């Protein structure tokens, strides 16, 4: 799933689910088992020589789950030669593509697209969120230079230019619980940062467009229905008449201590009726079911097929390398999973329980990841050099009409040559400008003499865009707090794409 179904599933459940009312205040406070064998494991081993691994992530602050991740999962990560994610979380192209994906066509805005009543309710709710945000933020966030006005503008700025489906996801991420979690890298991003720090090769099996286009594929009537349900849910929450059926805390609890086949992770179609609000009128229930079926097919099953085939092609092209594939946990649970796809290609994929030893392939590095979280292990920032393997995949995908197949990636000679080119590129770049960190919250945009270039802001993976006045002769920069590490969302995946992304990307 900054991940689209991972991002999208919790948001969608929030809209459609009806569950017994309960408090989740202490739901994530499950006890840490001292015995490794008693920990949850989201690790699967692809049996070959050397072995490769699947690891299921969730899009929550990594500090909430790191201590509960078994040591053998961390060892598998350390020993792997190449780490693959759903999306390339460190590539500026990912950010700009996500930005473009969210925006309405030129000249359109939400006021012209949405029914008047829904537009007014949306505007009123965002005004409420802006008013409440200072009280939602923690002293620690303020101490790091993350302030309410800036955070609100970074997340919801220019909302009138966004497509309605992205506004719906944005609304679902503008809650007190999610605001309090901003400023700590989510698990996916933390692993990407660690892979870069350990100088591992990294890559991605998907492009942003492959996660993004299905969301934009909903017809307008379905999007308006979903946005209306989202606003109703939030309005009821504000009135105190309903509680969130599935919260981030519930997700964390199930990941740390729950059943791997928990309803939150399981995408089996038999679970769907539990997610549909039975109080809806019959016609609206049909619409809700159609939306659920559409996204299940587009964001889970089709993506699993595509991702599984690309994993298979990578394994075949690099038989001497050990891979660590970190995808949203939802891709490995339920029916028609990535694991099922690999098995159909003849691979033996086995779940690896906590406590089971990982065979040392002699090519990894030991004791490089902290087994326990501490404040000192929180990454300060991450540089974003070109991603060698991902770049070739991206170029090849663009040059092939059949995007269901993975094109040629890299041979060893190609990798060596590209590494040399990359080192030369870095040296030239360092002479031109100061080295930048991923946590800087801004992306340099080249000015155009013909087009107004949008400003891109990133807060915890939430991408916002606003046009700036055209100025010639120099680049424009978006200034931001540089002392905070931020996570980039997808369902998802999304990206995972935001903590709609952070909630439209949680399992992806």
Swiss-Prot record:
Residues exposed to the Extracellular side: 24-485
Keyword annotations from UniProtKB, A to Z: Cell membrane, Glycoprotein, Hydrolase, Membrane, Metal-binding, Metalloprotease, Protease, Signal, Transmembrane, Transmembrane helix, Wnt signaling pathway
Cofactor note: Divalent metal cations. Mn(2+) or Co(2+).
Biological function: Metalloprotease that acts as a negative regulator of the Wnt signaling pathway: expressed in the Spemann-Mangold organizer and is required for anterior-neural patterning in head formation in embryos. Acts by mediating the cleavage of the N-terminal residues of a subset of Wnt proteins. Following cleavage, Wnt proteins become oxidized and form large disulfide-bond oligomers, leading to their inactivation. Able to cleave wnt8.
Pfam families linked: TraB_PrgY_gumN
Additional comment: Was named TIKI in reference to large-headed humanoid in Polynesian mythology.
Membrane topology designation: Single-pass type I membrane protein
Tissue distribution of the protein: Zygotically expressed in the Spemann-Mangold organizer, in particular in the head Spemann-Mangold organizer region responsible for anterior patterning.
GO cellular component, one term: plasma membrane
Cofactor needs: Mn(2+); Co(2+)
GO BP annotation list: head development; negative regulation of Wnt signaling pathway; proteolysis; Wnt signaling pathway
Keyword Transmembrane helix: yes
Signal peptide (UniProt feature, chain positions): 1-23
Sites where a glycan is attached: 219, 228, 277, 335
Name of the gene: trabd2a
Record-stated family: Belongs to the TIKI family.
Transmembrane regions: 486-506
MF terms (GO), sorted A to Z: metal ion binding; metalloendopeptidase activity; Wnt-protein binding
Protein name, entry field: Metalloprotease TIKI1
Cytoplasmic side: 507-508
InterPro entries per the UniProt record, alphabetical: TIKI1/2-like, TraB/PrgY/GumN_fam
Tagged with keyword Acetylation: no
E.C. code: 3.4.-.-
């Amino acid at each position: 799933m900054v991940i689209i179904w991972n991002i999208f599933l919790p948001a969608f459940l929030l809209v459609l689910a009806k569950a017994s009312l309960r408090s989740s205040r202490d739901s994530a406070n499950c006890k840490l088992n001292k015995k490794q064998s008693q920990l949850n494991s989201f690790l699967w081993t692809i049996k070959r020589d050397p072995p490769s691994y699947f690891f299921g992530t969730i899009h929550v602050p990594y500090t909430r789950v790191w201590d509960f991740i078994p040591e053998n999962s961390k060892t598998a990560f350390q020993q792997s030669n190449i780490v693959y994610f759903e999306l390339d979380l460190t590539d500026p192209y990912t950010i700009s593509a996500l930005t473009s994906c969210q925006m309405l066509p030129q000249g359109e805005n939400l006021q012209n697209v949405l029914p008047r009543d829904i537009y007014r309710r949306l505007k009123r709710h965002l005004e409420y969120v802006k008013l409440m945000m200072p009280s939602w933020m923690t002293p620690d966030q303020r101490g790091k230079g993350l302030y309410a006005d800036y955070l609100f503008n970074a997340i919801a700025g220019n909302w009138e230019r966004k497509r309605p489906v992205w506004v719906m996801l944005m609304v679902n991420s503008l809650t007190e619980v999610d605001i309090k979690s901003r400023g700590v890298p989510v698990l996916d991003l933390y692993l990407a940062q660690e892979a870069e720090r350990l100088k591992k090769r990294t890559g991605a099996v998907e492009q942003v467009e492959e996660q993004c286009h299905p969301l934009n594929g909903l017809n307008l009537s379905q999007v308006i229905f979903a946005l209306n349900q989202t606003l109703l849910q939030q309005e009821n929450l504000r009135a105190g008449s309903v509680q969130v059926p599935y919260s981030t805390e519930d997700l964390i609890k199930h990941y740390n201590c729950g059943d791997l086949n928990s309803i939150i992770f399981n995408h089996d179609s038999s679970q769907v009726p539990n997610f549909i609000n039975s109080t809806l009128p019959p016609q609206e229930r049909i619409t809700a079911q159609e939306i659920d079926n559409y996204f299940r097919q587009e964001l889970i099953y089709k993506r699993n097929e595509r991702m599984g085939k690309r994993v298979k092609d990578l394994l075949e092209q690099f038989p001497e390398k050990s891979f660590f594939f970190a995808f949203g946990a939802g891709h490995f649970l339920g029916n028609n999973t990535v694991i099922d796809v690999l098995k159909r290609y003849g691979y033996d994929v086995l779940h690896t329980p906590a406590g089971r030893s990982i065979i040392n392939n002699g090519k990894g590095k030991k004791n490089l990841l902290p087994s326990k979280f501490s404040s000192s292990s929180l990454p300060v920032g991450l540089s974003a050099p070109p991603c060698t393997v991902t770049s070739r995949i991206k170029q090849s995908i663009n040059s092939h009409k059949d995007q269901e197949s993975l094109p040629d990636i890299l041979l060893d000679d190609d990798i060596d040559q590209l590494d040399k080119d990359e080192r030369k590129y870095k040296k030239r770049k360092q002479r031109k400008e100061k080295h930048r960190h991923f946590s800087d919250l801004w992306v340099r945009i080249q000015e155009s003499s013909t087009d107004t270039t949008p400003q891109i802001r990133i807060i915890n993976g939430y991408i916002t865009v606003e046009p700036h006045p055209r100025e010639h002769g120099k680049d424009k920069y978006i200034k931001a707090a540089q002392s905070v590490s931020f996570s980039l969302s997808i369902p998802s995946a999304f990206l995972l794409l935001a903590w709609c992304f952070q909630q439209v990307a949680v399992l992806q």
